[in-house]
């Protein structure tokens, strides 16, 4: 193989994204909300991230929150949150249902990583069910 052919091949391998890093949509946000609220999706609400709340969120996440607000949906004591967080390298869109302060459902909606895809399966997500936030801003139990 000539030197030029080697450079072309190496360049192609580096620059062409692998099929494993393609965005995988497991559930659309709309479908998640429809399932959560039995077809009647409530109007979104907004939680503004400022002041003491911003500090608390940074303490919980271990980094400053991105953005100034978080949209969520709620009816009665049940709220649904669709959040995006960087996995190892790429964003992961996850959804959470919280009822009376406890996590009731966790779903991975969109996965963009090439590794760790197993987080979308129930054997992983179910470990968070029933978990709440303690007074010292930590999970009530370690999943």
Label each residue range with its predicted role.
Residues 7-16:
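Bacterial N-terminal signal peptides
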Residues 1-7:
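Positively charged n-region of N-terminal signal peptides that target proteins for export
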Residues 21-142:
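Flexible, solvent-exposed loop/hinge segments and secondary-structure transition points
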